[in-house]
Amino acid sequence: VNRLGKTRTARLAAVGVACALALTSCSSGSGDSRGDDRATARQASAETTTTSSPTTSTSSSTTTAASGVRIVAVGDIACADGDRTTSTSCRQADTARLTRSLDPAYVLALGDLQYQNGTLAQFRSSYDASWGSLKPITRPLPGNHEYYTRGASGYYRYFDRSAPGYYAWNAGRWRIYNLNSNCDKIDCAAENAWFRRDLDRNPRRCTIVAMHHPRFSSGREHGNNPSVGRFWKVAYNHRVDIALAGHDHDYERFVRLSPGADAQPRRGIQSFVSGAGGKSLYHLGTRKRGSAVFKASVPGVLVLQLKRGSYTWKFRTVDGRTPDSGSRDCL
């Protein structure tokens, strides 16, 4: 190749990188113990983490080559219109205000977005009044409360999406899978086969899998969900980096775990429960193996900064604090 050819090649490569950072594309698809064990402690020490630090400023840059792509991930959000607001319930307007101040590129909405029954009228009267301005950047998935309306029709109509509700999309260099974990309502065997195929087609990428029901949770109301183990096994075998869920109304971070809850710092999936989106807050139940941080006193959202080969996380609360934060490299 001559000098001119090399120059043109370099310019095309630069353009390709810029486009990859700027664009997103989607594809659709029809043993517990209390406290942390020593393996958990060793893994936690390998992470860069900070807890209980106040936050005084927010960067307005959502997507740059240096900072990556900023995503807010949260579920369990809006009370029915007219329900009484307290310090710990019906705070959807406050979590929406916090999210707008964070200026994310995307909102990953983790299900149970509109209580009690997820009807279209409820979505329009409550969720839309608080989180509606964020709808253009929202990438939702359904929770169990969406199915309190037959076929989750209110959810699908409000977000202009189609059943069965699982799909993949790109955020910068990351691949993100929004799954439907309501396996009593859809064919999760077919979904899992689609999930496996798409992971096979996208090797060596930093990856997130998101669903409403968490594989692991210390929340008293629900706790662990073995039913989503099928998704975790596929994710683990393909070296998925992060698992996100809601369902329990709290914030919880786990160290990297196998589908069987073994701490695996160099191989496991790091999971977060981010269900403190406004509806209400639950209490701590039995602390599950691998649980590193549990917070359930103030509503808030999980903020992820997805970079090339790494990520950072922050749990931001509506009172302006950051009770948990840290960073990790991808697997």
Report the location of each language-model feature.
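C-terminal motif of bacterial Sec signal peptides marking the signal peptidase cleavage site
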Residues: 23-25
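Active-site glycine-centered loops adjacent to acidic/histidine catalytic or metal-binding residues
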Residues: 76, 111-112, 143-144, 179, ...
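Bacterial N-terminal signal peptides that target proteins for export
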Residues: 2-14
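Bacterial signal peptide processing site
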Residues: 27-30
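N-terminal active-site segment of His-dependent metallophosphoesterases
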Residues: 63-122, 185, 190, 197, ...
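Extended active-site neighborhood of metal-dependent phosphoesterases/phosphodiesterases
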Residues: 82-86, 115-207, 222-242, 250-307
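Extracellular mucin-like PTS domains
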Residues: 41, 45-64
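Residue-level marker for buried hydrophobic side chains located in beta-strands
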Residues: 71-73, 107-109, 140-141, 209, ...
